[in-house]
Amino acid sequence: MWPVARFRASLTATRGRVGSGDPARVRQIDGQFALVHKQGRIVRMARSIGRPLRYFIAKRAEGPCLIVAERIDEIARFLEQEGLAGQFHPSYTRMVPAHYVTEVALVGCPDPNPVYTRYFNPQRNRLSHNLDEIGQAYIGSLAQALSGWLDRIDPAAPLGVLFSGGVDSGSVLLVLYHLLLSRGQSAARLKAFTLSVAGSGADARQAREFLDRLDLAYLLETIEVPESALNVRDAIRVIEDYKPLDVQSATAGLALCRAIRDRYPDWRYLVDGDGGDENLKDYPIEENPELTIRSVLNNTMLYQEGWGVGAIKHSLTYS
């Protein structure tokens, strides 16, 4: 663990990268982050895909007031405390889009649109058509990220993977398993948690088959919950979003996390993996009338960013 002074110095320097507005400097920030930098009337914000960052501009007699928080309800509570609740509406909040530096000028009414500068811009067609080369690069990046994470956490803490037996969670589980053994640590600290609702579910069967084939069934722990544990309203409240697939995923994930917390009150670290199919441009376009082969291929970051900040369908509030 880092000493407090070193952590603060690092945070100040990292915020300075965002404050520079230089996308190349922001791109060098490692790990997940959500950062805000203010210089005079100019506020710059940036986040990675794993951290939400929302903002709202309120009006005070002395000028515009920028409120920044992770959640919409945090913004609402702050405005209520400040006697500004009458200005609030959820649709007036804005999400800082991932992979951009968002620059807001606090110059008063009318508030100008923010300026977006992309700092993460992956290049297309960098790799050959060799699937082994693509797989090595993809899983190698995953291993590098997980290894850095293991370096920062308690080496004795138990680790859980939210496991469906699919390629994404399977890759995360196997890479973690490999990393623990390569560090001379016990794989017994690793568990594959799988949700089973009312004694049924394809994930539980798939998870068992996956691990049986690898002689790793001892890692599996199936978490049984009743149908009543699936609470859509709670899921929407947690993610503050409405898209059906996201709500469906969050509903199951929340039920699984709550059951793990009940069973292991002190468990702290959970890892999840998703989006691998989409990263390799495998989309069920037959199930989504909005998607075409052209829209999938022409939008490099479709899974992570949706239609993108320059598209008419992009949601400023939910992204």
Model regions: which residues?
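Catalytic subdomain that performs nucleotidyl-dependent activation
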Residues: 287-319
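Short glycine/proline-rich turn/loop motifs
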Residues: 119-129, 234-241, 315-318
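Short glycine-rich phosphate-binding loop at a beta-alpha junction
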Residues: 158-161, 269-273
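Catalytic metal-binding/acid-base residues of hydrolase active sites
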Residues: 168, 275-277
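ATP-dependent adenylate-handling ligase core
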Residues: 195-260, 264, 277-297
